[in-house]
Structure formats: C-alpha cells, structure tokens
Amino acid sequence: MTTQLYLDIDGVLVMEPTPPYPPDFRALDVRVADGRFVPVAYSETIVTALAEVIAEHSVNITVASSWQSDAPYLFREIGLPEVEWLDLSGPAEVSMFERKHTAVRAHALQHRPQRILWIDDHLPKTQVECDPLATSLECADTFLLSPSLRECLTAEHLESIVDFVALSRAETPAGR
C-alpha cells in the first residue's frame, strides 16, 4: 500500500533558534543546524523518530515547503534523506498555501497514492476545515496534520502519524 507524505519544513520540523522552545524540544535535545540562509532549531529525537517511522512503513516523502530547493540541503543537515520537492513558484498574489495545495493536489492526482499524509503548520486546525482539502486530493484515505505555530511536531503528533501509517486497508475508517 503506498502512503505519500507531503511535508512542510518550517514550523513542522524546524523553527527559529530562539527560545521559547516547544515543550517537546527538551533542552538537551535541541540542535541548531545550518539552514543555508538562516540557522534553524530542531528536536533531534523527533526528527529521528519521524525518519524511523518513514523507513519502517515505506512512506514516500515529498517536500511541500517554501524552502523548495534548499530542502535537500536542510534535510541532510538534520539527518533526513534527500527527497523530491514540489515547485511552488507562482504569482505573488497567490498565497504560498494556495500554491502548496495546488502542487500537492497535482502530485497526488499524477501519482495516485492509496493514502496521503499531509503535515503543514498552515493547514486548517479543525477537521471541518480540513475535510474540503482532504476531499480535493481525491484519495480515499487522507490524514491532514497541522502542528501549532512554534510547536513543530510533537511526540503526540508522532503517535498519530504511526497510527495512520500502520493501519491496514481493512482497518482504515472511511472519510478520514
């Protein structure tokens, strides 16, 4: 079963390297990496755990982030494999999130994964607001996850991610 992860970077994996740090960024766990044009802070434990989940469940990753061509560099810096990134170029009057949605939808329609996991801190925060976005991806099994600003991924988010990617097709609830 193919699971496609569309992953934002800033606000999901990394943040500005200035306190206050999110609660899950334990003091001894915070690392600062060279983000090429700006230093970034990240939780080594969270990033390592995400990499393990991705590897264990053979999840395909595509970056959907304003970092675009700098994503592979940053991924190497924080210990993740280099992956494909979506071209989010477009007119200035079109918001970055609208460009992300258009690019994610086009990629999903081209590749037709059986399951989609989209993690972005700019996704809507409620299920009611996420439903139209999930439906627009034309995939029966989608999970949209939006970490809070300056929180990045947490241990609780990782549990939700594992729950989603570990489900077999028979266990998957309709209309997620």
For each feature predicted by the language model, list its residue ranges.
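C-terminal cap/substrate-recognition subdomain and adjoining C-terminal extension
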Residues: 72-176
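Alpha-helical substrate-recognition element adjacent to the catalytic core
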Residues: 2-94
